[in-house]
Amino acid sequence: GPMFGLFLHDGGVSFATIFCYALGSCMLGFLSASLVKTPYKPPVKREPISLDRFILLKGMPAGLSLLLLSIPYGMTTNYVAMYAREIGIHTQTGFFFTFMAIGMAISRIFSGKLVDRGKITQVIAAGLYLVVVSFFLLASCVYLIQWNDTACTILFFGIALLMGIGFGIMFPAFNTLFVNLAPNNQRGTATSTYLTSWDVGIGIGMLTGGYIAEICSFDKAYLFGACLTVVSAVYFKLKVTPHYHKNKLR
């Protein structure tokens, strides 16, 4: 989505037309979803509404780690094109998301097999290390481009590939971690907690990234995001991993 939008914008397409494409995509998605047929399930008696109906309480530590991780991701999806222009990278920034998608595709080759073998926390830790490195490199591009703009441009897209591999490794592993902490009747709650943590973090990233860039610059916003990934990695190692191994149900 970001790649296609940036290509249209760089090609001189107006914002109104770009939003029309986005609206058309939403309508196609809604139409496709409405055609899905599922077997009828009779209503079941629900227990009184409580917090654990919506949030997996045992998944809160992992949710906090994921939220911290998704803040810089939200900054990237919304501001990386403006950051590239700010520091002087003038190539098609839509390719950043192309390489990011390639990295995610590469990660699927091996990450799923490792998760199936039970190496969930190890896979997430490996992805965290890659993401930490990639965000610090992204923040340093503002200095590297003064040394060699060609090398910095190559590194810029290399960062996207590395970031895609890191996040691609972690996405399915985090989802499995949440599900493994939940009893069978709360698997939906586990997935909801996973997605809520991710979406809230992206929203915070959009707000904080824009605010920091307004008062300082985008490289400072990404440096802040890189520091958050370090906090997330340390918290995952010290808190989430032992909590998961103590409370996992499968």
Located regions from the model:
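C-terminal transmembrane helical hairpin of 12-TM major facilitator-type secondary transporters
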Residues: 118-174
